[in-house]
Amino acid sequence: MNRLATGTAMHPAMTARTVTRGSVQQAVGGTAAMTQVALTARPITNMGMPGTRAVGGQRQVLDLGYYTSELRNLITATNKEAEALSKQTIELQKREGQLQRQQESLHAIQREVDELQGELQDILYSQSRLSENATLEDLRAEATEAESAASKTRNEANIAYKARVDAEERLRKNEASAVHLRTEMEAQIESTLGLQAAERYRSLNDENITLKQKESELRKELQEAAAVAANAYSFCTILSNYTSGGSISGQPGHIAMDERISGVDTNIQKAITLHRQIRAAKRELDAYKAKIKAAESHDPEQSLKQQLRNRFRVEQMETQSLVEEIKITESGVQQRKKLLEEITPDATVTITKEQKDLLKSVIKAEAFLVEFPNKKLALQTSIKQAQAEVVNLISRLPIPQGTVSVPGEENPGAIEAQLQQKSRELDRTTDTEMRVNAELRTYGDKVSALTDSLERLRADLRDAESIENVEAEESTLKTKLTSLKAMHEEETKTLEKSKGALRLIEDQIAANENAQLLRNLLDQLSANLQKKYAVELFIVQKTIESCYDEPKKKCLQLVSEINNILMGG
């Protein structure tokens, strides 16, 4: 019977030799011979597969079956995760649909609420007007006026919208033309002067724009100061005329001067009123300017328009400065041409070959210095690309078959999957623990309730220990119950009699005309009381609104101060 050779069996030629009579047996020594080698401690390899299979389950062979089983486990884990994710996505989609439906219903409810609030405001306004003894015709007239005002506002809004659309179209055209002009100017600058000159030109233009803005602001401030000074000068001249006229008016024979003084007084009053009106107008103008600035700051279209206008102005300034620079360069070129024409007849010295080579080398060095940064960047990018390709190739390399691996080693993806699974199990256990704790609390509450009921029953049993006392109490309770029943029957009879008498009285009252008149009078009285209360509230509100004591005091104080100033001046 043939027997397969295992991986650990000895070769037939390597069998132990028989010991002869003259041979000497020596003990084997050394660290290699004394070390004890276990079969399970040997490394895992792909060599000697039949022998390792014959040994049994002591060693694990990294063959095709091992890797296929690992891949199947990973595939099942990924499929489970994909199913869980798909379930979560379905639930989220359902929640999103529910939320969208709730939002739509909320918007519909808000619209209905707004409509109802508008109707309520209309009803309250009409009720207040009717309480003010207004007629339906007045209300209809007010409604028609409101409709006409609304139509006017709609027309104005439509006109404003059309103007806005036209302005946007004009703005787009201006933007396109400005962009085209700017590109042409930039190309011309770069072609004629170079990049450095163009950048310097732009920076100077920006500085020029800022300086012009500051100049315009200073001019405005100067104009305002001049206007204030002119007003003060006119006011001083009026006061000087008034004082000079006052000194002469007391003398006899100056009737015309007195008339002039009276005219001056009127002029002073007019000047004061005009000065106040001018101040009020300036305040209103400042308020309107502030509102316009706030609206422009909040309006992105206005800011965009302002930016485009500033750009257009900058480009205009750039073109003007560019034209001036071109003129300057042309004049410089003409001067250089003249100098060259003067120098050429005097240039009798010939350039040697060495000088020409030196000039060429200098030109090449300058070109290399100019192109060096670009070449450096290109080389760095190529090095980075090569490193990335090397990393990709290393990642794509297969696992070597003959390498030694440690038993029990797992894929990091599988470890992560196990970690996620353990975390899920931990979450489930925490949920179950919380649920169990809640159930234990409910059971504890039930047990406490049962113990309370048990204590009550025990107390009742203690009270009812003696049967005789219970029977005596039962007899007394029966007698009380019979007496209460008799009293109840008597009271029900009296109640029925009183009900019959009440019905008769109600019928008599309903048939009586005086009672009906009294009811009508009571209703009218309640309505009149409500009207009176509303009128009183209206009177109180109007008295509060029409109280001008404090403004009157302030006005009188201002008038007295003005008079004191004028008389003192």
From Swiss-Prot:
Its main location: other. GO terms for biological process: cilium assembly; intraciliary transport involved in cilium assembly. Keywords: Cell projection, Cilium, Cilium biogenesis/degradation, Coiled coil, Cytoplasm, Cytoskeleton, Flagellum. GO terms for cellular component: 9+2 motile cilium; axoneme; ciliary basal body; ciliary pocket collar; ciliary tip; cilium; intraciliary transport particle B. The keyword Translocase does not apply. InterPro entries: IFT74. It is found in: Cell projection, Cilium, Flagellum; Cytoplasm, Cytoskeleton, Flagellum axoneme; Cytoplasm, Cytoskeleton, Flagellum basal body. Signal peptide: none annotated. Residues 75-156, 201-231, 271-298 form a coiled coil. It comes from the Eukaryota. One of its GO terms (molecular function) is beta-tubulin binding. The keyword Lyase does not apply. Belongs to the IFT74 family. Component of the intraflagellar transport complex B (IFT-B) involved in flagellar assembly. This is Intraflagellar transport protein 74/72. It comes from Giardia intestinalis (strain ATCC 50803 / WB clone C6).
